[in-house]
């Protein structure tokens, strides 16, 4: 029997500002904590705000009875925060108690930066309002619109010692004054901390800041007997982390952090979790693979596939973001599968390769995401290569298809490719690990095809149409293997006088087991 995997789930604090029902301790218990009973969840992290504005019982708020921020007397979040403080001490106090009562660990989560649009943000926190000189872009500076530096200009600049001191005090308060199990530092909300041209050379500054937090945590742990944890969520590669000023390898090597959630969950199949696992070899640092509730990870089959791939890469568990909205039934059903690798190995899976359109900037925060997340393989243009070799894509899977097929355990397995600007006259050849797929048994559909895409966060899903076609292969004795696989797509014949480039936009492998 394989050891169970650890699951950490982040709740973004939605309930304080998003429901009309007055938020009380009973509501937090019923709507949040109790939904994880018997789910297999190990740790709940709850967003208490960011480094600019907080929604918990800070010392400043506690010192002002009946206080509501000026101009926010009718603000739901402010009213609910005041109510929770006056009744039972406040959100961090309440969540710590409720989680411990059902055997969950609790980590308050700090969003390490935010890049607000000044034109629409009504509350960006006093540090930004009182000290605009602490921001990544100064009021008298002009940036070229829609560039990375323009997009991150409203975030706090960690090159300023005042900013780092402010963050240290905020973070230490969360494990020093409360009976929490440590703290989560979420560097993926939102991942820009220095000016673009200064970030790599400034990475020692955040490392120094974390050393200070680690030192104080060790002191608190020694004096209280509590087992405290620093969990960090970082970009999906070590190189991208370092490029934006986060020296994750040093944090792991020096024991500054206990757990690393690798990636924001935007490209979980493509993210090289293996390099984090390798960096943690010989240390006590735990590596979690990150999944966010974005397409394709909105459906159980896709979540199963991503988890299987991350475990294949050596992850000791998962970090789930924006799955708080799922029902208690979903959490019990799905999370218990994810914690059990043996059960997961036989679960239905859909491996859907990520595509670049999902990372297109549409607000200031998304510029930071695009800044920290590397490009992926789709979409890709298909042409006539001079060497005769086709376009090659890599897909890593966690399923031992070869063994399962040999044992007669696979009910069906299909590979689906979606193209734009393809027609019935075009001839395509597909090879998997050098084995040609039988084109004569493939199913072809031409015309408009669609898929669900997260077109603009947080506007939910929408059907996006493509003019082209889909080719689907039913795989009997699938040539896929556990680990990395090579999918080669060759253009054999193209429609005469067709000017548009043939583009591969969608690759999906589905596996269902017998029993």
Model-based region annotation:
Residues 41-86, 192-196, 262-276:
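Aromatic-lined carbohydrate-binding/catalytic grooves of carbohydrate-active enzymes
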Residues 162-284, 302:
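Active-site neighborhood of glycoside hydrolase catalytic domains
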Residues 2-23, 65-66, 70, 75-97, ...:
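Active-site-adjacent "subsite" loops/lids of carbohydrate-active enzymes
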Residues 420-515:
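Beta-strand-rich ligand-recognition modules
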Residues 27-57, 177-182, 257-262, 312-317:
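Catalytic domains of carbohydrate-active enzymes, especially glycoside hydrolases
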Residues 17-18, 22-27, 49-54, 85-86, ...:
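Acidic-and-aromatic substrate-binding clefts and catalytic sites of carbohydrate-active enzymes
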Residues 403-414, 423:
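Extended extracellular/luminal ectodomain segments enriched in beta-structured repeat modules
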Residues 316-405:
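Aromatic- and carboxylate-lined catalytic core of secreted/periplasmic carbohydrate-active enzymes
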């Amino acid at each position: 029997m394989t050891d169970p995997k650890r699951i950490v789930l982040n709740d973004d604090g939605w309930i304080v500002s998003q429901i009309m029902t007055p938020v009380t301790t009973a509501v937090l218990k019923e709507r949040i904590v109790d939904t994880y009973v018997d789910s297999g969840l190990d740790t709940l992290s709850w967003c208490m705000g960011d480094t600019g504005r907080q929604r918990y019982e800070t010392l400043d708020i506690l010192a002002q009875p009946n206080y509501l921020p000026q101009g926010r007397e009718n603000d739901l979040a402010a009213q609910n925060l005041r109510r929770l403080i006056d009744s039972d001490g406040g959100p961090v106090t309440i969540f710590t108690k409720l989680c411990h009562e059902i055997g969950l660990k609790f980590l308050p989560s700090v969003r390490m930066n935010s890049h607000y649009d000044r034109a629409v943000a009504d509350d960006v926190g006093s540090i930004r309002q009182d000290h605009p000189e602490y921001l990544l872009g100064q009021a008298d500076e002009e940036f070229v619109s829609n560039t990375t530096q323009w997009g991150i200009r409203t975030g706090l600049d960690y090159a300023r010692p005042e900013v780092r001191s402010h963050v240290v005090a905020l973070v230490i308060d969360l494990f020093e004054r409360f009976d929490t199990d440590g703290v989560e530092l979420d560097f993926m909300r939102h991942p820009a901390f220095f000016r673009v041209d200064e970030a790599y050379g400034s990475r020692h500054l955040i490392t120094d800041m974390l050393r200070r937090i680690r030192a104080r945590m060790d002191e608190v742990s020694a004096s209280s007997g509590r087992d405290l944890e620093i969990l960090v969520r970082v970009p999906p590669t070590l190189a991208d982390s370092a490029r934006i000023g986060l020296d994750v390898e040093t944090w792991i090597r020096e024991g500054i952090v206990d757990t690393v959630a690798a990636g924001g969950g935007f490209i979980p199949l493509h993210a090289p979790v293996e390099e984090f696992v390798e960096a943690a070899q010989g240390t006590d640092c735990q590596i979690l693979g990150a999944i966010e509730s974005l397409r394709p990870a909105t459906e159980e089959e896709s979540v199963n596939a991503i988890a299987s791939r991350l475990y294949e890469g050596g992850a000791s568990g998962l970090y789930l973001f924006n799955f708080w909205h799922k029902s208690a039934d979903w959490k019990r059903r799905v999370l218990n599968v994810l914690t059990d690798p043996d059960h997961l190995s036989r679960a239905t899976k859909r491996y859907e390769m990520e595509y670049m359109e999902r990372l297109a900037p549409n607000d200031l925060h998304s510029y930071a995401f695009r800044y920290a997340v590397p490009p992926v393989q789709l979409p890709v243009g298909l042409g006539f290569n001079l060497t005769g070799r086709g376009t090659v894509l890599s897909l890593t899977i966690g399923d031992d298809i070869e063994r399962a097929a040999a044992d007669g355990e696979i009910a069906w397995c299909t590979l689906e490719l979606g193209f734009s600007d393809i027609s019935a006259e075009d001839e395509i050849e597909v090879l998997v690990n050098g084995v040609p797929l039988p084109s004569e048994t493939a199913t072809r559909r031409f015309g408009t095809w669609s898929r669900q895409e997260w077109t603009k966060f947080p506007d939910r899903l929408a059907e996006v149409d493509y003019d082209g076609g889909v080719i689907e292969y039913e795989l009997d004795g699938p040539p896929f293997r556990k680990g990395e696989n090579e999918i080669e797509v060759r253009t054999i014949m193209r429609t005469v006088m067709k000017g548009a480039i043939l583009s591969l936009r969608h690759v999906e492998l589905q596996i269902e087991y017998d029993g």
